């Protein structure tokens, strides 16, 4: 077994433990917690594949990290951190739009991977806009926080949200879920628009199939 593979796993185990302690103090935001859940599942799989005990690997990983920190100057650490690409958090929705309760007359729910898709099948002949809050890294969607479908009157008629009990999602997972939501809403003769932010980072095929972009005044 390659020694780099083992030491990488050990360091990942220790760093996950540090992040878990941070989350236990209720300091992590939604993208942070989502990555924590995804990485936990990944570490369990890697541990099983490598035949390594996670608790033991965590202790060894701590020793490796402590040794690196002893050798590294504060200035070097700052430079290393600054050179790593950081994710950006993009918002189509206000806090009020994200936290608002909504109800469905004819509810429909579908689970696609680790994403839950909900929509009101009673909505007909409406112009609907999809808005989302999510993080982006390397110009691609990293983590979806919440996506909601709004009528022109401001009513919420659909939603895509991550399932807390399951591991994280990919850009393709989100794209697939958006397609399901759009298809369900269009079935009742609704016209569905996708926000420019979503088009850019998560629904690139919108230009290919002729779906019109969100007019600037509705952005």
UniProtKB/Swiss-Prot annotation:
Residues 180-215 are annotated as: CPSF4-binding. InterPro entries: NS1, NS1A, NS1A_effect_dom-like_sf, uS15_NS1_RNA-bd_sf. Upon interferon induction, ISGylated via host HERC5; this results in the impairment of NS1 interaction with RNA targets due to its inability to form homodimers and to interact with host EIF2AK2/PKR. Disulfide bonds: none annotated. Coiled coil: none annotated. Residues 1-73 are annotated as: RNA-binding and homodimerization. GO terms for cellular component: host cell cytoplasm; host cell nucleus. GO terms for molecular function: protein serine/threonine kinase inhibitor activity; RNA binding. SUPFAM superfamilies: Ns1 effector domain-like (SSF143021), S15/NS1 RNA-binding domain (SSF47060). Homodimer. Interacts with host TRIM25 (via coiled coil); this interaction specifically inhibits TRIM25 multimerization and TRIM25-mediated RIGI CARD ubiquitination. Interacts with human EIF2AK2/PKR, CPSF4, IVNS1ABP and PABPN1. Inhibits post-transcriptional processing of cellular pre-mRNA, by binding and inhibiting two cellular proteins that are required for the 3'-end processing of cellular pre-mRNAs: the 30 kDa cleavage and polyadenylation specificity factor/CPSF4 and the poly(A)-binding protein 2/PABPN1. In turn, unprocessed 3' end pre-mRNAs accumulate in the host nucleus and are no longer exported to the cytoplasm. Cellular protein synthesis is thereby shut off very early after virus infection. The dsRNA-binding region is required for suppression of RNA silencing. This is Non-structural protein 1. The lineage of its organism: Viruses, Riboviria, Orthornavirae, Negarnaviricota, Polyploviricotina.
